[in-house]
Amino acid sequence: MIFLIISVPFGIYSLVIYNLTRRAPGKMRYLIPPLLTATLPALYLPLTGFKVSYDLLPVVGYLTYSQFLLLLLQLQR
Protein backbone atom coordinates (compact mmCIF):
# COMPACT_ATOMS: atom_id res chain seq x y z
CA MET A 1 0.00 0.00 0.00
CA ILE A 2 2.76 2.43 0.93
CA PHE A 3 4.65 1.42 -2.19
CA LEU A 4 1.61 2.27 -4.32
CA ILE A 5 1.24 5.69 -2.72
CA ILE A 6 4.89 6.47 -3.38
CA SER A 7 5.22 4.93 -6.83
CA VAL A 8 2.02 6.16 -8.49
CA PRO A 9 2.75 9.92 -8.11
CA PHE A 10 6.32 9.38 -9.24
CA GLY A 11 5.12 7.52 -12.31
CA ILE A 12 2.78 10.36 -13.22
CA TYR A 13 5.41 13.02 -12.56
CA SER A 14 8.03 11.18 -14.58
CA LEU A 15 5.64 10.92 -17.53
CA VAL A 16 4.88 14.63 -17.32
CA ILE A 17 8.56 15.51 -17.02
CA TYR A 18 9.33 13.34 -20.04
CA ASN A 19 6.65 15.08 -22.11
CA LEU A 20 7.80 18.52 -21.02
CA THR A 21 11.45 17.84 -21.80
CA ARG A 22 10.52 16.87 -25.33
CA ARG A 23 8.44 20.01 -25.81
CA ALA A 24 10.38 22.65 -23.90
CA PRO A 25 13.86 21.57 -22.82
CA GLY A 26 14.79 25.06 -21.66
CA LYS A 27 12.03 25.18 -19.08
CA MET A 28 13.23 22.09 -17.22
CA ARG A 29 15.57 24.09 -14.98
CA TYR A 30 12.64 26.08 -13.61
CA LEU A 31 10.47 22.99 -13.27
CA ILE A 32 12.47 20.79 -10.93
CA PRO A 33 12.28 22.81 -7.65
CA PRO A 34 8.46 23.25 -7.76
CA LEU A 35 8.08 19.56 -8.58
CA LEU A 36 10.16 18.67 -5.55
CA THR A 37 8.12 20.91 -3.29
CA ALA A 38 4.97 19.29 -4.67
CA THR A 39 6.12 15.70 -4.16
CA LEU A 40 8.07 15.83 -0.91
CA PRO A 41 5.06 16.33 1.45
CA ALA A 42 3.25 13.44 -0.21
CA LEU A 43 6.26 11.20 0.34
CA TYR A 44 6.96 12.45 3.84
CA LEU A 45 3.58 11.53 5.31
CA PRO A 46 3.58 7.78 4.59
CA LEU A 47 7.14 7.52 5.87
CA THR A 48 6.46 9.23 9.21
CA GLY A 49 3.74 6.83 10.29
CA PHE A 50 1.16 5.42 7.97
CA LYS A 51 -1.63 5.00 10.53
CA VAL A 52 -1.37 8.60 11.65
CA SER A 53 -1.10 10.04 8.18
CA TYR A 54 -3.85 7.97 6.57
CA ASP A 55 -6.47 10.61 7.48
CA LEU A 56 -4.24 13.41 6.23
CA LEU A 57 -3.32 11.72 2.99
CA PRO A 58 -6.28 12.97 0.89
CA VAL A 59 -5.58 16.52 2.08
CA VAL A 60 -1.91 16.33 1.18
CA GLY A 61 -2.76 14.62 -2.10
CA TYR A 62 -5.13 17.44 -2.97
CA LEU A 63 -2.58 20.09 -2.02
CA THR A 64 0.18 18.53 -4.09
CA TYR A 65 -2.21 18.02 -7.01
CA SER A 66 -3.29 21.66 -6.92
CA GLN A 67 0.35 22.77 -6.75
CA PHE A 68 1.06 20.57 -9.72
CA LEU A 69 -1.83 22.08 -11.71
CA LEU A 70 -0.60 25.58 -10.90
CA LEU A 71 2.82 24.58 -12.15
CA LEU A 72 1.37 23.34 -15.43
CA LEU A 73 -0.60 26.56 -15.81
CA GLN A 74 2.56 28.60 -15.34
CA LEU A 75 4.30 26.55 -18.01
CA GLN A 76 1.52 27.17 -20.53
CA ARG A 77 2.08 30.93 -20.42
Curated annotation (Swiss-Prot):
What GO terms fall under cellular component here? plasma membrane
Annotated transmembrane regions: 4-21, 28-50, 54-73
* Membrane topology category: Multi-pass membrane protein
Keywords recorded for this protein, A-Z? Cell membrane, Membrane, Transmembrane, Transmembrane helix
> Where in the cell?
Cell membrane
Protein's name in the database? Uncharacterized protein AF_1578
Q: Which organism is it from?
A: Archaeoglobus fulgidus (strain ATCC 49558 / DSM 4304 / JCM 9628 / NBRC 100126 / VC-16)
Q: What is the lineage of its organism?
A: Archaea, Methanobacteriati, Methanobacteriota, Archaeoglobi, Archaeoglobales
